[in-house]
Amino acid sequence: MDGHDFEYFCAEVLKRNGFSRVNVTVASGDYGIDITACQGATSYAIQCKRYHGSVGNKAVQEALSGKVYYGCKAAAVLTNSYFTPQAKETAHKTGVELWDRDKLTAMVKKAYPGQIWIPKQKKAKPKQKP
């Protein structure tokens, strides 16, 4: 699944988790926002990141600026991975919500009960000296 497919997958998962007015933004000129959606009365600007490594501070900053551009009440970064300490600190200070691999897994399980198995992310073993 490439990044574009991941955005559409996340949009469907959000719909199945009770979000309404879920829209995938156009690829260019999206101001870092991949999905806009509402949960109750709260409108969200959401950036999706399909990464192998940790998601950094830049994604949080882009979600925050995209929130302002789209006039949303909240911003979130949704990833199949985890976040760096710097990203967590910035999110805490700015109010951007961080939805990591564990949150995404829970949302997928709720969206597709009993249908999908998601493997645990394997941690790389440190290289041993010869």
Report residues per predicted region.
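Mixed-charge (Asp/Glu-Lys/Arg
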Residues: 1-130
